[in-house]
Amino acid sequence: NLVTLIKDNINLIKELDTTIIINFNSNKLEIILNSDGEQLSRVFFNLIKNSIESIQDKKLDNINFKGIIDITLNDSTSDMNFVIVDNGLGFGAFTGNLKDILNPYFTTKKKGTGLGLAIVNKIINDHNGTIDFIPIEDGAKINIIFIK
């Protein structure tokens, strides 16, 4: 059940920064995808963690900044859609390199390995899915679609 999987990841990772508000909405109480739950858990954990880190970096310039992460999971007859939107730094650091964001060893983090999103992309592809990084005005949006 992906709803439970995402909620479990939110509960685990929100301890990294309890000041960030994480909202989760789903159009169903139970969404089943024929998948490797452990691998998908890694995807959701990594993406939520990246959002938290982006918000924390933005807070360095504004101590009163209120971080928000909105996560949506919707199921339809043909696909399952996972969307995460945050009001962190966004993809500004990747301007001109957005296509490289999924390449192994590509990173803008001081202590990053550049493997996180490459692994996320492989797991999503292995599950018949696609991932898109969408720059928005005040943050970042990531859209994942799994075809059933």
Please describe what each predicted stretch is:
Residues 1-10:
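A conserved beta-strand-to-alpha-helix junction within the catalytic ATP-binding
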Residues 19-31:
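Conserved catalytic submotifs in the C-terminal HATPase_c
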Residues 32-35, 108:
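Conserved micro-motifs of the catalytic ATP-binding
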Residues 91-104:
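Short conserved segment of the HATPase_c
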Residues 124-125:
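Detector for a conserved hydrophobic position within an alpha-helical segment of the HATPase_c
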Residues 129-130:
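Conserved glycine-rich
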